[in-house]
Amino acid sequence: MAPRGAGFVVMAALLAAAAAPQMASRAAPALDYEFFKARVRPIFLQKRDGHTRCYVCHAESNNAFWLERLSPGASTWSEEQSRRNFQMASILVNPGDPATSRLLQQPLAPEAGGNVFHSGGRQFASKDDPNWKILADWVNGQKL
């Protein structure tokens, strides 16, 4: 005769097995370095009308988000610098959830759902901005 709790254990195991595919589909996507390097990294260096480049305020700053300083004469980062920037940017995102990722909320206008506490410029007037969408794609696990 099985112990009294055996039925509960079997039922719990069956429920866990049934939920496993759903739980797996909700797993956070991995952030892709190659997508970051090709599509996200240029955004940090890009001059936008009426705004300074992200790089200007965030190069080795005391901000929560800092970027590597460009080497003298360089127009972009080295591989090593890019990997450090990737790690730094990754800290400020919740993979799979652009709406709660600081990297996307800080430069977004408050009227569009951005964080009102960002002291820097509002790079994106809305979530329809092509560069905001690129950042969101990266956070959602987009790959090249």
Describe the residue ranges of each PLM region.
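Residues at the start of alpha-helices and the adjacent loop-to-helix junctions
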Residues: 5-10, 99
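Aromatic- and Gly/Pro-enriched helix-to-coil junctions and flexible linker segments
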Residues: 19-144
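N-terminal secretory signal peptides that target proteins for export/translocation
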Residues: 1-3
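Bacterial N-terminal signal peptides
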Residues: 8-18
